Amino acid sequence: MDAGDRVFEARYYGKCAFGAHGQGDCIQKLESEDCLYLNIWVNTDDKTEKKPVMVWIHGGSYIMGSGSQTSYNGANLVQKQSDIILVTINYRLNMYGFMDFSSVPGGEKFGTAPCNGLLDQATALRWVHENIAAFGGDPGNVTIFGQSAGGGSVSILPVLKQANKYFQKVIAQSGSTGLAFPVNSETAQGKTKALIEYTGCKNMDEIMALSEEDLQKAYVEAVSKFTSCPYYGTEVLPEAPIELYKKGYAKGITIMAGSTADEARLFMGEGVDLTLEEQKLFAQRAVGDAVPYVKEEDKKYYEEFRRVCRFQEPGLIETELIDDLMFRVPMLQQLDVQSAFDKTFCYYWSYPSSNADMGAAHSVELLFVFDLRGVGTSSVFNGTNISDEIFNATQQMWTNFARCGNPSTDEIEWKPYSVDDQNVMVIAGPGDIRMEKGLLAEQYKAVLPLLKYYQFMDKFFTPGYLADILAAREQGSQLRW
């Protein structure tokens, strides 16, 4: 948009980042490097002055998604919670948003590239801070919230000096500081090497001269096999985010965070709905192939996890380990550290989809946060148990936190989380929303020393596993590993 005082008729969603449509339900179909747009939902019938502002940062593994997905339509939320302003944003994805060029001649000029996507988010937050009052919002009462990669983003932004002055509260859904990898990792350097080898470019000038079409082809054919995420040990993130939390970089920010009971079930089929038995086979092979990366002195923690796991059935044990390593344990570690500086709140979502094979899978709570009844964007949402009680309680808790930093409602007292108290709000179903102390605490203790292996998690989802499972399904045979 050109600078100036003219009125801009914002009747259509702005373009999405390259890769956005991997998520599948983006309303805007155009992708471009010109993608830094945001959307604002305001209930104009509500005359509340200085409305609380909630800024949504989308997920999608840092490779897909946008703020204009059907899943994040804010109309129902601001209709029911009329004093809330909702903002959803775009940011650069995959190699456009998260790429290290330090090993490429001329790459020293691109020191922010490993975290450009985070800086895009920071820029959006600055825009909200400077302009939201014109829409009736309070720039001094801003909550950032996100899920999956969005949950990782809102967990990292509190330690980012370019961002943390623009918000006061965080809701991290199924994402944590663990969603940042070291810049010298195989994942980070492998992406750069793949781009160089595929394009034949010898320096940054040649890379910058590539057309959008050439870059997209290189991404699809070579770079996409590597995980995308923010990288630390860089100009933007000098240390691992959890280490910056320990130093008090996020002091003054109140955080609410949680995970679902069956996170990994969404990922195992890679877009194909697997039965529970097929998921268990997938998890057994994935964890079995990852165990060799664990040092001998750390294998005792893996054995301890198997002993204390809430499941004792092969396949479910491994699925739970993936859930804990990727989501629940790094989230709890983050809350443990931050609770020394500010109030923190924790939840555990176990209310399942009526799709029994999916359970309470990754993303299931989005239906209730945004009130997506009838949207049906994935197997997690389709057929999800519909409960007005859970819809109303979820939205009230989330928006109360945005209003005042406390998610309690008139009916539900939500106690803060701390290392000593370990209070967790369990959202299990109608008539079963309750506080628990020390939920799955033994699992947490067993997995915490294994978080150093988090960066190998992408090895848990090797496409060959799925191909073998589907071949066995086609042949009607039993697959054993």
What name fits each language-model region?
Residues 92-94, 145-149, 348-356, 413-419:
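Short, solvent-exposed turn/loop segments enriched in Gly/Ser/Thr/Pro and often Arg
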Residues 123-131, 395-408:
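K/E-rich alpha-helical interaction surfaces of small helical-bundle regulatory domains
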Residues 140-142, 202-210, 315, 346-348, ...:
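Surface-exposed patches in mature extracellular/periplasmic domains of secreted proteins
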Residues 1-118, 139, 376-394, 405-413, ...:
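Non-catalytic accessory segments of hydrolases
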Residues 72, 116, 120-123, 148-149, ...:
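Generic recognition of stable, solvent-exposed alpha-helical segments in well-folded globular domains
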Residues 169, 212-388, 397, 404, ...:
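Substrate-gating cap/lid region and adjacent catalytic-acid/histidine neighborhood
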